[in-house]
């Protein structure tokens, strides 16, 4: 039996013998092509040659190309792991001719390699050819069919439609008819019972396409028209993993030596055996596939991120983590540990894996740990929303809730949809998109500020007295009107102020300007051109009056607690993690603090606990504030003061000291550390390579955090009837819920079966079409099952239409047979139009569609409208 390495090498040797130049794989991540993020086919690196933009270097080439298909037309992500042959990253064995040979040689050599070199059984092979497209003036590919007739009987040469046999890289670009080679790997008994010709392109896991020969002769323009390419091109692609499956006598790509070494390591980590549990097997296949994609993307320079190609890689990584978390009990980072076995299986062919091993492991580990935190929060929130949705008798999650999970908690929409599908639900994507659009509009509006001219009342500069005073007398020096977010506001500069203007990460003070019987709200204080600017919602009646400028003392003290805590936190982090820790940024508000610092790995729970303990000791020591204003910077540095990231310092600085913590700082601070009360870390994450972020609360915020945890535990205990072992009680409850869910699903399945039998028994025929319908009360989910059962079991031309009343709601449903769809009928369009009769809307796919509405009296009319659109009675 040939190994994967031997198969890859044999392909290259064969085409080298046919005078092809063997070229290395292009990077999987595409640079410089606005139409592509990833290499999704072997021809991508030759696109400019095919279009005639650059001269060919060789007339014939062959290679093994790393490819990634997860977005756009070639979106295979949801199938990966659930079947035996779909992948995100895969290798494409390919040979090309640029204006040299064409169909005859391509077909001859494909046959020679498969049958004479690899010894595949020709009786198991089928070829498809393009049937033509009258709409585009394209005839059947009789030339290719004629060449295939030299090797295959006519019943092994099949016509294929435009979807299967006219290859296009995308909405625009090179394209042309193609000829697919399929192999039937079923047993002799199965082949005798059902011809392989009937299984081609029917998604049978053992009757699969292994090679696609594309006869590229057109370029698809942006307007959809076709133009001839400068020279005819042969572009072939053979799925390496599928070929290995066929040659190694396996029933799944994942059973070959391409994946099995990785799967065995995953199974060992999970303490299970591959092949013993369906859902665990799916999870292991997902992880084995995705680790390859992620590793190769990183070697090609694409790190996970929240934008474009980086987001795709992050999605794939998070999907794998989610499967490991849910089905293999992988609650800690584990995927980075798969790098050694991946290198063992693919390092020889792709040495870049070996060179980048340390980077790949580090990036994957950090991403895993970050997402595990997000996952726990997101799943918990989504579970709650699903329960609320089901309790309301609905199966569609509010799109705003899905957007909140995405926007606020970083929970990917595709994972939300996956979890919903597993629970028989879906998300309102239209509503989600609307929420996304509104957010973009808000961001645009927030960025636009219109400012008027300054009106000067007095000359002078503003003096800050807020280190010593919470309020003072003040007069307005100047003011101006601004317009922000369609609101009219005013900026005021005072001659002296206790208001701290936002700087150094500390937010600005809020408070009031008070004069006689008037109290003006100061909603923020910013620094513009080194001026403390007070933002107010309205101008005082008398702008020349003398005011009492008074800050919100409670919020100021909360800010001071958090700011002083960042100094103690900084010192504690250096003590626990090492002196390489340096502040890279901070954010201090009354509610919480954020502290960014240099560190090259996740701060562990144990390290966080040590940091909290150290900060707690410094708080309880009640160190007094030692403040040195206007100290020469050289003297401050001699004292051990640390200069902080992003700050500019003059010749004289302010030094803030608590015990052994000494920093240069212009912010406001508490008189003694004891006022902080306590500090609790509520989050730790990576914000950039080598930069970590800690989020924490202090004082009252820390108390509220602890109370919330206690309340949660009490609530859970109450829900679990105060069982002594909460975790065990919850586990039991989950198991019971799972059993109940299964019983409900069994009931719906059984009910669907009975309902289907009743509907089929009452079927009629109209214009040669079998007509099945239902109007009345029923469970919408059960009826959907009925629709798909009918499609699976009905070979004749048919239409199934249902008008369903379920829990005071009405649903219109339509399922069409394949032949009706090929004739041009589209269930989604028909249902969308008919839904007007029930005052609703909806749509769907060409085969199946649904619409919801509120006018139950119009159901029968809607059903009639559907039948009329189909052309039946």
Swiss-Prot record:
Binds 1 zinc ion per subunit. Its EC number is 6.1.1.7. Transmembrane segments: none annotated. Gene3D superfamilies: 2.40.30.130, 3.10.310.40, 3.30.54.20, Bira Bifunctional Protein, Domain 2, Threonyl-trna Synthetase, Chain A, domain 2. GO terms for molecular function: alanine-tRNA ligase activity; aminoacyl-tRNA deacylase activity; ATP binding; tRNA binding; zinc ion binding. Its cofactor is Zn(2+). It is an enzyme of class 6 (ligase). SMART domains: tRNA_SAD. It is found in: Cytoplasm. Its main location: cytoplasm. GO terms for biological process: alanyl-tRNA aminoacylation. Catalyzes the attachment of alanine to tRNA(Ala) in a two-step reaction: alanine is first activated by ATP to form Ala-AMP and then transferred to the acceptor end of tRNA(Ala). Also edits incorrectly charged Ser-tRNA(Ala) and Gly-tRNA(Ala) via its editing domain. NCBIfam families: alaS. Consists of three domains; the N-terminal catalytic domain, the editing domain and the C-terminal C-Ala domain. The editing domain removes incorrectly charged amino acids, while the C-Ala domain, along with tRNA(Ala), serves as a bridge to cooperatively bring together the editing and aminoacylation centers thus stimulating deacylation of misacylated tRNAs. This is Alanine--tRNA ligase. The gene is alaS.
């Amino acid at each position: 039996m040939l190994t994967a390495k031997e198969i890859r090498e044999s392909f290259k040797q064969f085409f080298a013998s046919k005078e092809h130049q063997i070229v290395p794989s292009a990077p999987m991540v595409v640079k410089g092509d606005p139409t592509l993020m990833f290499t999704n086919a072997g021809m991508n690196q030759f696109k400019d040659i095919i279009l005639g933009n650059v001269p060919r270097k060789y007339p014939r080439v062959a290679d093994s190309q790393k490819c990634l298909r997860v977005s756009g037309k070639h979106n295979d992500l949801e199938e990966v792991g659930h079947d035996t042959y779909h992948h995100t990253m895969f290798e494409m064995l390919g040979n090309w001719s640029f204006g040299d040979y064409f169909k005859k040689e391509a077909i001859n050599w494909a046959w020679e390699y498969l049958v004479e070199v690899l010894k595949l059984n020709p009786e198991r092979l089928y070829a498809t050819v393009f049937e033509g497209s009258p709409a585009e003036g394209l005839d059947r590919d009789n030339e290719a069919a004629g060449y295939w007739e030299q090797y295959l009987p006519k019943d092994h040469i099949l016509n294929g439609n435009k979807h299967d046999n006219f290859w296009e890289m995308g909405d625009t670009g090179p394209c042309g008819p193609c000829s697919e080679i399929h192999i039937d790997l079923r047993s002799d008994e199965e082949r005798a019972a059902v011809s392989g010709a009937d299984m081609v392109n029917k998604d049978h896991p053992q009757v699969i396409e292994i090679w696609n020969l594309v006869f590229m002769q057109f370029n698809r323009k942006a307007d959809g028209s076709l133009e001839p390419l400068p020279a005819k091109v042969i572009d072939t692609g053979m799925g390496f993993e599928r070929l290995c499956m066929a040659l190694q006598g396996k029933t799944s790509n994942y059973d070959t030596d391409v994946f099995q070494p990785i799967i065995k390591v995953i199974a060992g980590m999970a303490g299970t055996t591959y092949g013993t549990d369906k859902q665990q097997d799916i999870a292991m296949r997902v992880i084995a596939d995705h680790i390859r994609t992620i590793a190769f993307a990183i070697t090609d320079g694409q790190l996970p991120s929240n934008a474009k190609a980086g987001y795709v890689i992050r999605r794939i990584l998070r999907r794998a983590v989610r499967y490991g978390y849910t089905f293999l009990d992988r609650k800690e980072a584990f995927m980075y540990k798969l790098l050694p076995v991946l290198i063992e299986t693919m390092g020889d062919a792709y040495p870049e894996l070996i060179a980048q091993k340390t980077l790949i492991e580090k990036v994957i580990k950090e991403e895993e740990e970050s997402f595990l935190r997000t996952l726990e929060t997101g799943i918990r929130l989504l579970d709650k929303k699903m329960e609320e949705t089901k309790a309301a008798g609905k199966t569609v999650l509010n799109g705003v809730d899905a957007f909140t999970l995405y926007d606020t908690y970083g929970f990917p929409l595709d994972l939300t949809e996956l979890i919903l599908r597993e629970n028989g639900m879906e998300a309102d994507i239209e509503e989600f998109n609307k929420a996304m659009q509104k957010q973009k509009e808000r961001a645009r509006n927030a960025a636009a500020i219109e400012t008027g001219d300054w009106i000067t009342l007095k000359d002078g500069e503003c003096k800050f007295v807020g280190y010593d005073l919470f309020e003072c007398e003040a007069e307005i020096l100047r003011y101006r009107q601004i317009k922000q977010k369609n609101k009219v506001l005013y900026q005021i500069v005072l001659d002296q102020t206790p208001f701290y203007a936002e700087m150094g990460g500390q937010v600005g003070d809020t408070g009031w300007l008070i004069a006689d019987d008037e109290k003006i709200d100061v909603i923020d204080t910013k620094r513009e051109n080194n001026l403390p600017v007070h933002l107010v919602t309205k101008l005082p009646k008398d702008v020349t009056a003398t005011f009492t400028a008074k800050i919100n003392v409670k919020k100021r003290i909360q800010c001071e607690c958090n700011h002083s805590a960042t100094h103690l936190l900084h010192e504690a982090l250096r003590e626990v993690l090492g002196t390489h820790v340096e502040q890279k940024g901070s954010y201090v508000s009354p509610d919480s603090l954020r502290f960014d610092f240099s560190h090259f790995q996740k701060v562990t729970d144990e390290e966080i606990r040590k940091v909290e303990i150290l900060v707690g000791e410094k708080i309880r020591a009640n160190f007094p504030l030692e403040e040195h204003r206007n100290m020469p910077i050289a003297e401050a540095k001699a004292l051990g003061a640390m200069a902080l990231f992003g700050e500019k310092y003059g010749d004289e600085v302010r030094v803030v000291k608590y015990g052994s913590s000494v920093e240069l700082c212009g912010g406001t601070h508490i008189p003694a550390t004891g006022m902080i009360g306590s500090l609790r870390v509520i989050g730790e994450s990576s914000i950039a390579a080598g930069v970590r972020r800690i989020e924490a609360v202090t004082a009252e915020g820390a108390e509220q955090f602890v109370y919330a945890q206690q309340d949660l535990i009490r609530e859970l205990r109450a829900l679990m009837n105060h069982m002594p072992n909460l975790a065990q009680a919850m586990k039991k409850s989950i198991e019971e819920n799972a059993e109940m869910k299964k019983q409900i699903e069994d009931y719906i399945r059984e009910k669907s079966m009975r309902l289907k039998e009743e509907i089929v028994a009452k079927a009629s025929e109209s214009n040669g079409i079998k007509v099945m319908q239902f109007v009345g009360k029923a469970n919408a989910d059960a009826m959907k099952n009925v629709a798909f059962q009918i499609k699976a079991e009905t070979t004749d031309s048919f239409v199934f239409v249902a008008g369903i009343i379920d829990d005071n709601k009405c649903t219109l449903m339509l399922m069409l047979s394949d032949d009706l769809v090929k004739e041009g009928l589209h269930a989604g369009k028909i249902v969308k139009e008919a839904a007007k009769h029930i005052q609703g809307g909806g749509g769907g796919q060409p085969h199946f569609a649904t619409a919801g509405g509120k006018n139950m009296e119009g159901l029968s009319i809607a059903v009639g409208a559907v039948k009329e659109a189909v052309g039946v009675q």
